[in-house]
Amino acid sequence: MAVPKRRVSKTRAAKRRTHYKVSLPMPVKDKDGSYKMPHRANPTTKEY
């Protein structure tokens, strides 16, 4: 089993964690002009 040779500093650990981000959902404009999530069925226009 791998064991770290030395302690990882708070700064170094934080720099590594900067890439763990949550991507924001990108809504798309529907035919009726409202913004919806992609790949979801729209109950008003009955479209996917």
Curated annotation (Swiss-Prot):
<dbReference type="GO" id="GO:0015934">
    <property type="term" value="C:large ribosomal subunit"/>
</dbReference>
<feature type="region of interest" description="Disordered">
    <location>
        <begin position="1"/>
        <end position="48"/>
    </location>
</feature>
<comment type="similarity">
    <text>Belongs to the bacterial ribosomal protein bL32 family.</text>
</comment>
<keyword id="KW-0687">Ribonucleoprotein</keyword>
<feature type="compositionally biased region" description="Basic residues">
    <location>
        <begin position="1"/>
        <end position="20"/>
    </location>
</feature>
<dbReference type="InterPro" id="IPR011332">
    <property type="entry name" value="Ribosomal_zn-bd"/>
</dbReference>
<keyword id="KW-0689">Ribosomal protein</keyword>
<dbReference type="Pfam" id="PF01783">
    <property type="entry name" value="Ribosomal_L32p"/>
</dbReference>
<dbReference type="InterPro" id="IPR002677">
    <property type="entry name" value="Ribosomal_bL32"/>
</dbReference>
<protein>
    <recommendedName>
        <fullName>Large ribosomal subunit protein bL32</fullName>
    </recommendedName>
</protein>
<dbReference type="GO" id="GO:0006412">
    <property type="term" value="P:translation"/>
</dbReference>
<dbReference type="GO" id="GO:0003735">
    <property type="term" value="F:structural constituent of ribosome"/>
</dbReference>
